[in-house]
Amino acid sequence: ADDQPVFIPPAFTEGPTPTNFGPSDPTPTSQPPQIWLDASLPDSYLEQISSGLSIQVGKSRDQAAVVVLPGEENVITRWVYALAAPFPTIPDNVSESEIRSAWQGGESTTFNGSPIFLTANTLEVFSQLWGDPAEGSVQVTAADQLQETVWDRRPAWALVPFENLEPSWKVLAVDGISPLQKDFAAEEYYLSVPISVLGNSDLVSGLDLSNRDPEQLTTVMLTGVTALVRATAWTMETNGVEYPARDIGDWLLEADILHISNEVPFVRGCPYPDPGQSGLRFCSNPKYLRLLESIGTDVVELTGDHFGDYGPEAMLNTLELYNFRDWPYYGGGKNRADAQKAVKFEHNGNKVAFIGCNAKGG
């Protein structure tokens, strides 16, 4: 029996103890940065930047990484407004103090106590900057009715975003500064609205938009009737040919396109000017062309009554003088086709054409 094999039961290896995985707290997901846009910003500014933002617009200023609002804290751009009136308005300039006084309830002497007409958004923009206006000092009007309302209430004035100006408005300077001027500086202008960015401005681009781009503006000046005859010509003989431009020459040279409506032909041997001349047959000495050269003439109108006073030869000679100086002309010419052609300019993407006629005797 001692020789019998001993049975040894197999050993069982205990398996690993299962680990109990209980629920854990979720790791918070970081929120993308947001931008907060103040509701009192100009509508047109909000419309432009909202379409191209690469960052989410938030509803809370406190949670936003970038804040955009009116104010001088960290100015990135200025939104330009114009003080406008119906085109037949006589005054050209209004003082900052008169605007401020009118806003606060004082009576405008320039516009006979008229309220300042503006849209609801413009009211919100300037209330943020100037405080709430006095009762009755402004009148809110829908944007599509503003122009008609102000025209019906003449004499009257309005605050108009620069991009909404139309030819029927006359833009008034404020303390001598107008947004139509070539040397306009928005930071010096009372009606430019500063827009500031607070926070991490590197997170978003395209906030420095403007509603006044000088690269899209064209200045056209029209002198009206120009006749270098009688007392004007006599004064030029006395004080120098360029004397009439002494005080306005620099201003005329600012124009991108300067129009001159020269009434009379240039005639060699034209009689010496008589300031008391009673007759109505006129000509100018060709040396007077120096005046038109000095002010930067770009186009000449020939519809004046007296262009034919010295006959066809004088007219044709005058056209040659213009051609020699590369001055295009219209409303008259060497033949019907020449007289009927338009003079066209293209500047900063703007197209300007001049046409004219004289219907007297027609």
Model-predicted regions and their roles:
Residues 206-362:
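Acidic, metal/ion-coordinating pockets
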Residues 21-210:
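Flexible loop/hinge segments at secondary-structure junctions
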Residues 1-31:
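Ser/Thr-rich, Proline-interspersed low-complexity disordered segments
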